[in-house]
């Protein structure tokens, strides 16, 4: 943005602000402070866009000449600028912050809606989103925007929406070139209104129930997101709605052949597909380098539906990679809720960003779409051949060691996840997850970081006398119906 453009932009913006300021003052809202924050940080937002790929403003490097992978489809020897790739990315469904939707009541002991006003200055169109939802910002009792707290919900919606698009429209679907009523039906399922099965409202509703008890305005983690997706998909499945997708959640990344087979052969009605969700933590502060290749390998498989994750307190939807750079869609772009004559285009974008796998936060939710038994066998074979270090396959769930094979080693560098079966209130769901503070870790044995399996030699040579390796890990397990979970890997 040039200095002249910035000046003109600032002048017009200040005129808009002055028109609204009198009304805000009458209503007792301190708009002056908010506006000061918006104008002083606007240049920061421009600088934050430096990683964004645009058609007209790019200098191609040797790194960008490598092949590009987008949800299992590989483009060799084609510039990332190529129109074919851009159209493929544009066809992916993009979920973002929204403003001005039907109010969601706050909890008395939960976050306050106005406490998130200041976070608007860190989003890419703070001015328009602020004024479009101006009256909503003055409502102390309801949320009318998810700015500042809903990014994990949005990336989870994106993962699920692209799952449905892949399942019912195929990998070759091109939005804009191929117009399909089914595409619009999929988007309708994610509208920000209570009647839409996968709306923000319904994500919050099912997450507010036991055991998660997430309140409106609170951030979701991968576990809360995966359980919310399961509950919502179960509701659609049981109502014989469009797209009967069964969800399997595996915190330990263990998959059991007999359970997958049973789901495809005994459930009535037969599911159109199984969505495997892996809410995992692959390191401490960043993804352990031992998992870098495995993360990329999963995105390269045709069963991949992406990853919801990113950086601490900022979730992105990862749909592919180029070299060691992950490509993602950013939900931190507030859009006003519009009427349906123009809404569908707002769920697609030409803009995408990149993040080095070295800088990726270790906490994420990985999505895998399995269409039938043969598809599962193909997926299993691909992971086995590549020696994928994230997923583990077992022929049967009855004799599998759900604690993993790591109990003989110390677990020092991970958050401990405790799963208590007594907390189960809905039999089809797995149960609450209680994080133990790091202050308590020195007195606890049994920390499990999946990377320790490959660091065992170092671990053996650097024994810590504060840990008693002979003491067994005391973690209760739960396996309910077709869903199975484990604490064998470190999880958020």
Curated annotation (Swiss-Prot):
Main location: cytoplasm
Function: Cysteine protease that plays a key role in cytoplasm to vacuole transport (Cvt) and autophagy by mediating both proteolytic activation and delipidation of ATG8. Required for selective autophagic degradation of the nucleus (nucleophagy) as well as for mitophagy which contributes to regulate mitochondrial quantity and quality by eliminating the mitochondria to a basal level to fulfill cellular energy requirements and preventing excess ROS production. The protease activity is required for proteolytic activation of ATG8: cleaves the C-terminal amino acid of ATG8 to reveal a C-terminal glycine.
The protein's name: Probable cysteine protease ATG4
Keywords attached to this entry: Autophagy, Cytoplasm, Hydrolase, Nucleus, Protease, Protein transport, Thiol protease, Transport
Family the entry assigns: Belongs to the peptidase C54 family.
Family annotation (Pfam families): Peptidase_C54 (PF03416)
GO CC annotation terms, alphabetical: nucleus; phagophore assembly site
Top class in the EC scheme: hydrolase
Region (Disordered): 454-492
Annotated EC: 3.4.22.-
Native source species: Debaryomyces hansenii (strain ATCC 36239 / CBS 767 / BCRC 21394 / JCM 1990 / NBRC 0083 / IGC 2968) (Yeast)
Active site residues according to the UniProt entry: 151, 330, 332
Superkingdom in the source lineage: Eukaryota
Compartment list: Cytoplasm; Nucleus; Preautophagosomal structure
PANTHER family attached to this UniProt entry: CYSTEINE PROTEASE, CYSTEINE PROTEASE ATG4
Protein's GO biological process: aggrephagy; autophagosome assembly; mitophagy; piecemeal microautophagy of the nucleus; protein processing; protein transport
Molecular-function annotations in GO: cysteine-type endopeptidase activity; protein-phosphatidylethanolamide deconjugating activity
Residue spans crossing the bilayer: none
Catalytic activities: [protein]-C-terminal L-amino acid-glycyl-phosphatidylethanolamide + H2O = [protein]-C-terminal L-amino acid-glycine + a 1,2-diacyl-sn-glycero-3-phosphoethanolamine
Start-end of Polar residues biased regions: 474-492
Keyword flag Hydrolase: yes
């Amino acid at each position: 943005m040039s200095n002249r453009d910035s000046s003109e932009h600032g002048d017009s913006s200040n005129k808009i602000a002055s028109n609204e300021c009198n009304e805000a003052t009458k209503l007792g809202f301190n708009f002056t402070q908010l506006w000061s924050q918006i104008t002083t940080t606007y240049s920061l937002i421009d600088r934050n866009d430096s990683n964004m790929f645009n058609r007209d403003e790019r200098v191609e490097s040797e790194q960008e000449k490598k092949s590009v992978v987008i949800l299992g489809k590989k483009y060799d020897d084609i510039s990332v600028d190529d129109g074919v790739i851009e159209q493929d990315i544009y066809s992916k469904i993009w979920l973002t912050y929204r403003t001005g939707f039907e109010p969601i009541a706050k909890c008395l002991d939960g976050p306050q809606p106005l406490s998130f006003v200041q976070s608007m200055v860190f989003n890419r169109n703070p001015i328009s989103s602020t004024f479009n939802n101006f009256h909503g910002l003055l409502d102390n009792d309801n949320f009318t925007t998810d700015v500042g707290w809903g990014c994990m919900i949005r990336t989870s919606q994106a993962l699920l929406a692209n799952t449905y698009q892949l399942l019912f429209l195929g990998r070759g679907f091109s939005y804009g070139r191929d117009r399909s009523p089914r595409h619009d039906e999929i988007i309708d399922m994610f509208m920000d209104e209570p009647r839409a099965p996968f709306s923000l409202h319904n994500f919050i509703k099912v997450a507010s129930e036991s055991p998660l008890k997430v309140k409106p305005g609170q951030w979701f983690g991968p576990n809360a997101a995966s359980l919310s997706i399961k509950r919502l998909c179960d509701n659609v499945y049981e109502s014989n709605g469009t797209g009967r997708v069964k969800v399997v959640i595996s915190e330990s990344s263990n998959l059991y052949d007999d359970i997958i087979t049973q789901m495809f052969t005994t459930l009535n009605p037969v599911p159109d597909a199984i969505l495997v969700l892996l809410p995992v933590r692959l390191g401490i502060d960043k993804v352990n380098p031992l998992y870098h290749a495995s993360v990329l390998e999963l995105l390269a498989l045709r069963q991949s539906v992406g990853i919801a994750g990113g950086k601490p307190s900022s979730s992105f939807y990862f749909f592919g990679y180029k070299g060691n750079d992950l490509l993602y869609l950013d939900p931190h772009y507030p859009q006003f809720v519009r009427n349906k004559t123009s809404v569908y285009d707002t769920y697609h974008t030409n803009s995408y960003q990149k993040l080095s796998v070295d800088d990726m936060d270790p906490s994420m939710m990985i999505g895998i779409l399995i269409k039938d038994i043969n598809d599962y066998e193909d997926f299993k074979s691909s992971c086995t051949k590549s020696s994928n270090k994230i997923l583990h396959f077992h022929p049967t769930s009855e004799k599998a060691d759900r604690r993993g094979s790591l109990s003989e080693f110390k677990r020092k560098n991970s958050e401990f996840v405790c799963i208590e079966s007594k907390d189960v209130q809905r039999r089809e769901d797995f149960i609450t997850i209680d994080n133990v503070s790091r202050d308590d870790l020195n007195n606890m044995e049994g920390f499990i970081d999946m990377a320790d399996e490959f660091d065992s030699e170092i671990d053996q040579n650097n024994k810590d006398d504060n840990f008693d390796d002979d003491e067994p890990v005391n973690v209760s397990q739960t396996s309910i119906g077709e869903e199975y979970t484990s604490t064998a890997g470190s999880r958020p």
